[in-house]
């Protein structure tokens, strides 16, 4: 099988090289770019994200990413969000929200609000188990593994049509991963999650056509 061509979206997000290297290690042909044609023609698009929700959205808008993502999804072309790249797929985030305001607007691919974790220690930084649903394509062959998280905010719910993998930190049960046709995302960092993360990326590559 020919190597799958994957674009990791370049919009100023930090530490994207680790995602590029992780994808290359599992056999992908990877390009780091925001070129419209490259994004449209790639077998898969990865949207990484670290830092503040609003800053990630500003970066995405600066390269026209919302339109590029919408076009890919309309054509059934796979997209994978990572960390804040998952959060921005929801309607909005409570991060930096003040009284009387709605918070930062996201891409609204999935309805819902990203909220601060309720836990004795925030951020959630380290390895945690997850609970994938039966039949998950991302977690095929992966059982009882831990994945690496670094975040202070998370989605606590998702629309019924989204297949959700759950995790827990403190008092908060949150969306650790989500699968919805061509659109998938992880709150954890698969590129920093060792063999289990590599297997998940390999599974995602296997869904690309």
What residues fall within each predicted segment?
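Cysteine-nucleophile active-site neighborhood
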Residues: 50-127
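An anion/phosphate-binding loop that grips the pyrophosphate of nucleotide cofactors and donors
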Residues: 42
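Amide-donor transfer/coupling interface in amidating biosynthetic enzymes
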Residues: 74, 112-209
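N-terminal beta1-alpha1 ligand-phosphate binding loop
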Residues: 6-27, 190-191
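Structural alpha-helical scaffold elements that stabilize or flank donor/cofactor-binding regions
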Residues: 38-39, 72
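Extreme N-terminal starter segment of soluble prokaryotic enzymes
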Residues: 2-7, 183
């Amino acid at each position: 099988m020919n190597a799958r061509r994957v674009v990791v979206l370049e919009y100023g997000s930090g530490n994207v090289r680790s995602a590029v290297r992780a994808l290359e290690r599992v056999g992908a042909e990877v390009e780091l770019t925001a070129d419209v044609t490259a994004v449209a023609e790639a077998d898969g698009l990865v949207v990484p994200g670290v830092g503040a929700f609003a800053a990630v959205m500003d970066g995405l808008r600066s390269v026209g990413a919302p339109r590029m993502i919408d076009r890919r999804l309309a054509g059934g072309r796979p997209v994978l969000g990572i960390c804040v790249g998952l959060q921005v797929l929801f309607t909005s985030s409570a991060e930096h929200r003040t009284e009387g305001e709605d918070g930062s607007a996201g891409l609204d691919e999935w309805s819902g609000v990203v909220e601060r974790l309720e836990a004795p220690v925030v951020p959630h930084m380290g390895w945690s188990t997850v609970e994938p649903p039966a039949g998950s394509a991302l977690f095929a062959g992966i059982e009882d593994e831990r994945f690496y998280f670094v975040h202070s905010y998370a989605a606590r719910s998702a629309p019924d049509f989204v297949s959700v993998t759950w995790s827990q930190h403190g008092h908060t049960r949150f969306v650790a991963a989500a699968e919805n046709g061509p659109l998938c995302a992880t709150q954890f960092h698969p590129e920093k999650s060792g063999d289990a993360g590599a297997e998940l990326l390999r599974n995602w590559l296997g869904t690309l056509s």
